[in-house]
């Protein structure tokens, strides 16, 4: 019998009315701290979006309290077992939006959104020829893993997606549109925006990639790579049948699923690289970042000017 791990990570969201997000955030933070949870929760007038970790007992108490609050009636928690906390601290922050689209005329998913497809239906729809699959996440999320045949919008943040669609509308014309994201929250708005733009056949993966990977029937099939998550785990598996690595090392192009942030704090770009290349390239995405006086790798490892110069010389010699 499989042993249960001592911790859990909860992923959830709900579009619901929260009258005073600032007041709610302060009270909710105190509540989460009383349970000794750690995580990141965003609160807006339009609802709540959170990931938090704790022991089985702590997370049970949290879910029970949320389920007993009429504002969160019907909320769905996606649960991962874990060996420890997935966060260092607990943050609950009020925001103007749960996901940042910054539309002049905002989308209310209760009023307009794409058709919900359960994992099995989404799986079948992906195999149809007249279908286009749009990844509603950012480029670095796509690079770690995505559905086979999915289109990668060239965007660094969610708010860039509507403009990208308008600039590439010929891809979607006359097609059935499928869209997906990590847990479903971005697609609720994005698919609604597509419907408002006049696209008639728009569907979204209900519960997102996380739900798809746990579904006992599809078992994550047609997914390549891993799923990027916004906590200390960074990546979680999806496809239970086969593991295909799609990520490529920033420096060598070799298969890689290990993300680090560029050591120049002014850049902070997410790059895939091996431990070996992290050391070789001083965890910096470019020469400019390597020679930054604020290079965090150099500071962290207390490298001397001579050691940095030798590393730069070696990189130059191998070009």
Swiss-Prot record:
Keyword line: Oxidoreductase, tRNA processing
UniProt domain Rhodanese: residue ranges: 127-221
Transmembrane feature ranges: none
Statement: the UniProt record of this protein carries the keyword Acyltransferase: no
Enzyme class, spelled out: oxidoreductase
EC number: 1.14.-.-
GO molecular-function terms, A-Z: oxidoreductase activity, acting on paired donors, with incorporation or reduction of molecular oxygen
Any Gene Ontology biological process: tRNA modification
Disulfide bonds: none
Catalysed reactions, as listed in the record: uridine(34) in tRNA + AH2 + O2 = 5-hydroxyuridine(34) in tRNA + A + H2O
Domain of life assignment: Bacteria
Catalytic residues identified in the record: 181
Gene3D superfamilies: 3.30.70.100, Rhodanese-like domain
Family (UniProt): Belongs to the TrhO family.
Record's function text: Catalyzes oxygen-dependent 5-hydroxyuridine (ho5U) modification at position 34 in tRNAs.
Protein name, entry field: tRNA uridine(34) hydroxylase
Lineage: Bacteria, Bacillati, Bacillota, Bacilli, Bacillales
């Amino acid at each position: 019998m499989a042993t249960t791990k001592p911790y859990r990570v909860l992923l959830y969201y709900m579009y619901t009315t929260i009258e005073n997000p600032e007041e709610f955030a302060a009270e909710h933070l105190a509540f989460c701290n009383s349970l000794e949870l750690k995580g990141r929760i965003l609160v807006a007038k339009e609802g709540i979006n959170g990931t938090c970790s704790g022991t089985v007992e702590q997370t049970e108490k949290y879910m029970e309290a949320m389920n007993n609050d009429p504002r969160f009636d019907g909320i769905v928690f996606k649960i991962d077992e874990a060996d420890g906390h997935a966060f260092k601290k607990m943050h609950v922050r009020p925001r103007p939006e749960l996901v940042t689209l910054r539309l002049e005329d905002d989308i209310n998913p209760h009023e307009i959104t794409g058709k919900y497809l359960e994992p099995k239906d989404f799986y079948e729809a992906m195999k149809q020829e007249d279908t286009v699959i749009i990844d509603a996440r950012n480029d670095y999320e796509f690079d770690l893993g995505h559905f086979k045949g999915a289109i990668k919008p060239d965007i660094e943040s969610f708010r860039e997606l509507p403009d990208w669609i308008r600039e590439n509308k010929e891809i979607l014309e006359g097609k059935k549109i499928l869209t997906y994201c990590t847990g479903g929250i971005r697609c609720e708005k994005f698919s609604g925006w597509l419907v408002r733009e006049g696209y008639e056949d728009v569907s979204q993966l209900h519960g997102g990639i996380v739900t798809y990977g746990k579904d006992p029937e599809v078992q994550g099939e047609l997914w390549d790579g891993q799923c990027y998550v916004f906590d200390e785990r960074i990546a979680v598996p999806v496809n239970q049948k086969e593991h295909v690595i799609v990520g490529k090392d920033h420096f060598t192009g070799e298969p890689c699923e290990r993300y680090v942030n560029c050591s120049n704090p002014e850049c902070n770009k997410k790059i895939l690289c091996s431990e070996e290349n992290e050391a070789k390239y001083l965890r910096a995405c470019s020469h400019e970042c390597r020679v930054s006086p604020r290079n965090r790798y150099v500071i962290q490892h207390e490298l001397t000017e001579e050691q940095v110069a030798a590393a730069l010389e070696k990189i130059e010699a191998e070009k």
